Amino acid sequence: NDMESLEAQLKKCEPDKVKLIVTDGVFSMEGDVANLPEIVRLAKKYDATIMVDEAHGIGVFGRGGRGVCDHFGVSDDVDLIMGTFSKSFASLGGFIATDKEITNFLRHHSRSYIFTASITPASTAAVMAALDIMESEPEIQEHLWELTNFALDGFRQMGCEIGHTSTPIIPLFIRDNN
């Protein structure tokens, strides 16, 4: 999430070479949210492609749980959005949302795609049901945020060191063995 470092790396790249910025939407260790608006700005400035892993953002951020890209209104500026169905969807498998050209490339060159089995019909049905619930019952997402804020406030009142998280990922830092 260090934009100065990212820009320094992009400046080092040859202008005519492909540049890929890969980031989590929500970083799983400390719950930091990626600065996607700034990443998009830098990607446009340096003609870079953006890939966002929404594993911890889907179901939590954005309209109907669409993720951090939607939360910041940059979904159309992100070239690849990927995620898992094993967290918010309580199922199996995952997804990559991208354009047709990249999809075809991935289908023909990704070993993990070529040498894997398809998602089962039952897992697909579970994902579809979860999507319907996320869309039709926004109060579930609102309740998640109420519980998150309650937990954050409680940990802070107890004097726990939780860093700067503002997400449901709450790290508890323990600095010694006592």
Mark where each language-model region is.
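Active-site phosphate-binding strand-loop segment of PLP-dependent enzymes
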Residues: 1-52
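Short, small-residue-enriched loops and turns at beta-alpha junctions
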Residues: 3-5, 25-30, 57-60, 113-114, ...
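Short beta-strand
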Residues: 19, 82, 116-117, 160-166
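Active-site PLP attachment segment
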Residues: 70-105
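A short glycine-threonine-serine/GTX helix/turn-capping micro-motif
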Residues: 92, 110-119
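Structural motif of enzymes handling amino- and sulfur-group chemistry
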Residues: 118-137, 143, 147-152, 156-157
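Conserved PLP-binding catalytic core of the aspartate aminotransferase-like
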Residues: 142-151, 157-178
